[in-house]
Amino acid sequence: MEVLKKLKLLLWKNFILKRRKTLITLLEMLMPLLFCAIVLYLRLNSMPRKKSSTNYPAVDVSLLPVYFYNYPLKSKFQLAYIPSKSETLKAVTEVVEQTFAVDFEVLGFPSVPLFEDYIIKDPKSFYILVGIIFHHDFNSSNEPLPLVVKYDLRFSYVQRNFVSPPRHLFFQEEIEGWCTAFLYPPNLSQAPREFSYADGGNPGYNKEGFLAIQHAVDKAIMRHHAPKAALNMFKDLHVLVQRFPFGPHIQDPFLVILQNEFPLLLMLSFICVELIITNSVLSEKERKQKEYMSMMGVESWLHWVAWFITFFISVSITVSVMTVLFCTKINRVAVFRNSNPTLIFIFLMCFAIATIFFAFMMSTFFQRAHVGTVIGGTVFFFTYLPYMYITFSYHQRTYTQKILSCLFSNVAMATGVRFISLFEAEGTGIQWRNIGSVWGDFSFAQVLGMLLLDSFLYCLIAFLVESLFPRKFGIPKSWYIFAKKPVPEIPPLLNIGDPEKPSKGNFMQDEPTNQMNTIEIQHLYKVFYSGRSKRTAIRDLSMNLYKGQVTVLLGHNGAGKTTVCSVLTGLITPSKGHAYIHGCEISKDMVQIRKSLGWCPQHDILFDNFTVTDHLYFYGQLKGLSPQDCHEQTQEMLHLLGLKDKWNSRSKFLSGGMKRKLSIGIALIAGSKVLILDEPTSGLDSPSRRAIWDLLQQQKGDRTVLLTTHFMDEADLLGDRIAILAKGELQCCGSPSFLKQKYGAGYYMTIIKTPLCDTSKLSEVIYHHIPNAVLESNIGEEMIVTLPKKTIHRFEALFNDLELRQTELGISTFATSVTTMEEVFIRVCKLADPSTNVLTEKRHSLHPLPRHHRVPVDRIKCLHSGTFPVSTEQPMRLNTGFCLLCQQFYAMLLKKITYSRRNWMLVLSVQVLLPLAIIMLSLTFFNFKLRKLDNVPLELTLQTYGQTIVPFFIAENSHLDPQLSDDFVKMLVAAGQVPLRIQGSVEDFLLKKAKEAPEGFDKLYVVAASFEDVNNHTTVKALFNNQAYHSPSLALTLVDNLLFKLLSGANASITTTNYPQPQTAIEVSESILYQGPKGHYLVVNFLFGIAFLSSSFSILTVGEKSVKSKSLQFVSGVSTAVFWLSALLWDLISFLVPTLLLVLVFLWYKEEAFAHHESIPAVVLIMMLYGWAVIPLVYTVSFSFNTPGSACVKLVVMLTFLSISPVVLVTVTSEKDLGYTELSDSLDHIFLILPGHCLGMALSNLYYNFELKKFCSAKNLSDIDCNDVLEGYVVQENIYAWESLGIGKYLTALAVLGPVYITMLFLTEANAFYVLKSRLSGFFPSFWKEKSGMIFDVAEPEDEDVLEEAETIKRYLETLVKKNPLVVKEVSKVYKDKVPLLAVNKVSFVVKEEECFGLLGLNGAGKTSIFNMLTSEQPITSGDAFVKGFNIKSDIAKVRQWIGYCPEFDALLNFMTGREMLVMYARIRGIPECHIKACVDLILENLLMCVCADKLVKTYSGGNKRMLSTGIALVGEPAVILLDEPSTGMDPVARRLLWDTVERVRESGKTIVITSHSMEECEALCTRLAIMVQGQFKCLGSPQHLKSKFGISYSLQAKVRRKWQQQMLEEFKAFVDLTFPGSNLEDEHQNMLQYYLPGPNLSWAKVFSIMEQAKKDYMLEDYSISQLSLEDIFLNFTRPESSTKEQIQQEQAVLASPSPPSNSRPISSPPSRLSSPTPKPLPSPPPSEPILL
């Protein structure tokens, strides 16, 4: 039941995602139907026509065709005989020569090799009409012929006389040459073959003189054995050959299309399905969603079953519709008129199932969706190519070869279609009664069996590859996967084995003895390899994690925290060592472990189209919750996470913070016993982060929690034990108090300075009181000083002095605390890696407090000024105008080159190897088919066709012999045939039989005979069924053998073999054989390969768009023209490479139609003009896609359909037999707007025109009108002509399409369609205003500072714009979705030079929207904004020259290094080339990124990526720098480094606007800030101004030791209430209390003394007291008015779990709204500033 429940959930998930991916789902279901529509269109435009009976006249075989009498030759035709040593053969040949009125020359050859060598090498061999080779060893020259005679007739390889007009279809109806490799045409038809030829037509047995020569040789043999008798007999005997009559029939030209094009179209229709399936499966794999579900208990096989059922249902619908369309008569015709619809459905379903499993198999070999999709689709197409060869040699293939070829599902499908079309041609269709009928020792039933076998094999391969080679993610299974799995010996949980103590034992706290170690890690290593280099991410890690505890894992960026989490969750395998979870080893028992595992990854693993509720419901039930419990817990989790108002929002529309909340909820739901949380609160605002802390504190009771974070206060609050990693090694581990005790150096005093602060004077004051004080940090407005613990008795005097001289010293506020976790972390990092000591280097004295640890301010100023210190000491001027455009163009071009260089495997495979491989395989198959298969000997006996029925009429008492009938019967029986003597007309009998039993008639009745006596003369008619290629000669052989037996006895026999001559030297060199249809094969195959090539140009553009790198480049100053034209230039250069290689391939294969000296320029021109047209089209369409993988798949499908379909339609309808040439011309003109059609038709016409020229030349038609023979096709001497078979109009169309699509691209980039829509909305202004007013009736801000700022801007706008770098006036932003959203509401502010302006607010408050408007990523709905005097709305190009932007999410290109990216943006900014290196090096030095500067960005940690994003914003000369949460994901050391850099940039005269969730960051950096709530400013001013206005109280935080928590907590509360009357308990986190104390009558020194004593009396682990912080003010604004302490506690009681653990506490409810009334100011502040203790 549990398995069925999980399966049901997975199916629900799949169908929800498919339903919400409307376009993909429609594409998956409709693309096969679109190809079906093409088939239906062809069916309806090739209607069957009724034809009456046809009788053909007899042909006299005693005469050569007229052709030989009129052929203009300089020399005589020659009759060659072999071996020449036999005089007997010479005499026989001379008798043959004398038979005809044509003057022949008799020529003998000693042996067959000499004859063939002469044919191949000597030009005179053209005159040899036939070689007669007798299979008999002559001992002497006069030795007679035996009675059993066998000889070969070797006519020329190419017919001389029979000129069949060439076909312009993808498949020829007939095979060229003598067709000796085939018994029947590959394309059977109900209509008579070669309808207009009485002698049978192709392969030309009569026209080429084969029958006449054969009969003459047979008569000569008879005369040799019975000279007189033979002479007498043939005086009164006349031998004729006559074609079978053909009864009334339906001539259906569609059958040719069905037999040949339908397999190709069916394959192309299902390739779309294969691409979508592969992409869907790989997308989940690439995003780690599959492995994430596995961690929730979903076995891998269950995952596959769910996917199979999902796609099975969707393809079932498609196949059902296809079956209905194919089998339902429309306008009295159907695609399959006679076949059983049930069998058609079963056949298509078997193929669909095989396609599904093929996609599954291909997905296991790849990790990236777009790579796997491209290669998977290519391989799927390749598996069809063998059929193109097999179909033309089907009867030559052995049964084993056929079986093996059908292991490719496409070959099996095409073979099945072949069976269906054959039965349709016979008029019976495929039925249950004939599925076992054998055609070439194979049957339709076997095809169905092979499709099912293919499905099983593909499934098996997928299972083995995934199990044994999980590649990047997952744990590989053992090779004995099918064997009985040995039961692992699980050691006792508490005694798995104590890990050895590391060398840093003094910093490892003793393990708790009374708790269960749920997770044990023993000597764990993880090494990553990249080429020859390796990186050790985890080095000898040993530690235990305990139930009921939160273990916090800290470390700098890249220390190995995420790697540890990935190993424990089974996402990656350890290189060495062991890890046990609940006693199960991760490398062996991951399935068991995952049943109790909850994981919140560092990067959200969410389904884009799942809602918040869907995620919680899905994962809750996967973990075992019942639907009712899951519903309740989902509602509870929504409330706890503050996501109630987003319950129905899809995850792709959530902000980053909301996604983190959802990921945490997924990990927590259903009570997972082991929680691994990788930076769970990254990106969350302060209220949300605190709510998550509450939630984790409540939920940890019976769980084991491993948490990583960069927030030290989070680690301090949540961590029962804290472990710190550095470079993969464990440095220390223990409780927060233990680590503070080990690493603490005393008390830390944090001083927030004013701009007027005199640092030297302040240092002297501190040094005067505390001589041993040490400077830890001096960044921005923040200064941190260490006060040794032994000098605590001097603190009171120091604090009194600082309070009294606060204004004089320039102190905004100061605070003191005992050692914090941040300081512990920094000290640990310094000890482990001295390179991190750049900013935190200890000072041995504060006097004179130099800042030598920082880069001087003047060095950073050079980045943002007009001069730059170089050796020449010349001022640096930024490039402008044309020079800037050239530099930017060069930067964009280098970016494209770098992408191609770094992704060379992808570029090489998709853009070069793939199209070339397709064309090479096609050429290999086609060349082998056309030039090799036909040159085989064929023995002309009835046994070749199996057992047949031979009707015959012989008159009673025939003049030839009264026993003639009996002799004929004996001869047939001896040959294994069935004689059937009839009375009357043989022709009438054959017509009757064909009408009575059309099924199988052509295979049962191949030849017949009629012996008619008229007076004393006998007429012998050898009747042949022309549906069989070689029946004319067979019928003649049958009659001649009977006559030979009459003359020489029953033992006499003649066996004739048709063995074409080898190709002559001229034929080989000039490829005389017409190969026009081969060109269409190549075109269709090549169009598919070129679709992948074309779609590959979207990968980078969509990738840049998805990470918003393109937007950042535009913001940095790149114009639309520069961005796209540089990309187009490089992509055209890239397009030239496969084009030139393609020409080389044609030269290698000697494909003259494309490799001729006149054709090569045309091929290159066609290809390059196609690239010119299609690349801008791909760029334009790429705007519709969000991920490179989906873009690649959809574009391949689109380009394949829009290129192959038009070419097929136009080519098929152009066939003269269909009678739709006018329609073909119309379609051709319509499809000129499609580059793929132009490419296909141009190449097709180029090939076809060349082949027709060869055809006319080969047939020696220079003296007659070749165009008449070609049935209307006009050979163009000038291939560039516009007329039929010219390529001129296609080249012109491609040349015009390029600018058209480029214009569309620029219009799309400029949001022209959005602007047009907005302009059109102006026709209904009253409606819009009324609608806006109804929805956005928002109150004006109440804060007087906000109102004053807005009023000032209104009054003095022009003056402010001139004097200030940034002015924002009443800016609003409305997102016009289904429900319009007001994101920013009339915001006004001014930012001056050397000012850092902070935007604070909850997630979704509108901060990023302001940035998007300032950078013009989003248009301003109303209002104005000015940068350096330029209006953003009208002068965006000029504005962008002055803006530097660090977006919220890293807009970085993974294929570039950090240095390369900075260089690129330096060029975009216009920094002269000679200064770029120094500029970039300086930024890297300041950001401490020199070590990783030359590594690829994809290897960077999150913190390093943020650092690089900030560096990009600083490049060049931006007057205004916008930093959107720049320090997200950074460790404390990196964060302080960033602060230092930003502060120095501000000091250099720049204007900075910053958003952040770190209040500490805002206090350190911001000179002014505003708090936003629901798009409005609620307050505005400097941090100190806001504290003075709203923070007139003190904040006391105290942390009681957990050991004494219950005992001392209440006593301490009573102490605070008694000591500080009026205090208010604002928050409580188990052992952490936060009080707000009234401000009046409190002194810093007095409070410090009281709390020092309380620390001892009440077992306090840590405490602090400070003026109400900026974070407290922020929380006050963002907290709902109704959220009082009592109400919060009441909500906690309701939401608490039914049986909470003993150490759990009530949890505070997170804010449920994003707005609150402005807090009222408290009474005036006391004269002294409080201190953080």
From Swiss-Prot:
TM stretches of this protein: 22-42, 262-282, 306-326, 342-362, 372-392, 403-423, 444-464, 906-926, 1082-1102, 1128-1148, 1160-1180, 1192-1212, 1230-1250, 1287-1307
Example GO biological process: lipid transport
Region of interest called Disordered, as start-end residue ranges on this chain: 1681-1733
CDD domains in the cross-refs: ABC_subfamily_A
SUPFAM superfamilies registered for this protein in UniProt: P-loop containing nucleoside triphosphate hydrolases
Positions with biased composition (Polar residues): 1681-1692
Domain ABC transporter: 519-752, 1366-1599
Post-translational modification remark: N-glycosylated.
Annotated S-S bridges: none
Reactions it catalyzes: cholesterol(in) + ATP + H2O = cholesterol(out) + ADP + phosphate + H(+)
Binding residue positions for ATP: 555-562, 1401-1408
InterPro entries hit by this protein: AAA+_ATPase, ABC2_TM, ABC_transporter-like_ATP-bd, ABC_transporter-like_CS, ABCA, P-loop_NTPase, R2_ABCA1-4-like
Cell location: Endoplasmic reticulum membrane; Cytoplasm
Biased composition (Pro residues): 1718-1733
Alphabetical UniProt keywords: ATP-binding, Cytoplasm, Endoplasmic reticulum, Glycoprotein, Lipid metabolism, Lipid transport, Membrane, Nucleotide-binding, Repeat, Transmembrane, Transmembrane helix, Transport
Bias kind Low complexity: ranges: 1704-1717
Membrane topology field: Multi-pass membrane protein
Tissue specificity remark: In the testis, detected predominantly in elongated spermatids at the late stage of germ cell development and in sperm, with no expression detected in immature germ cells such as spermatogonia and spermatocytes or in somatic cells such as Sertoli cells (at protein level). Expressed in the head and tail midpiece of elongated spermatids and sperm (at protein level). Expressed exclusively in the testis.
Positions of glycan attachment: 609
Function: Promotes cholesterol efflux from sperm which renders sperm capable of fertilization. Has also been shown to decrease levels of intracellular esterified neutral lipids including cholesteryl esters, fatty acid esters and triacylglycerols.
Protein name, UniProt field: ATP-binding cassette sub-family A member 17
Species assigned in the record: Mus musculus (Mouse)
GN (gene name): Abca17
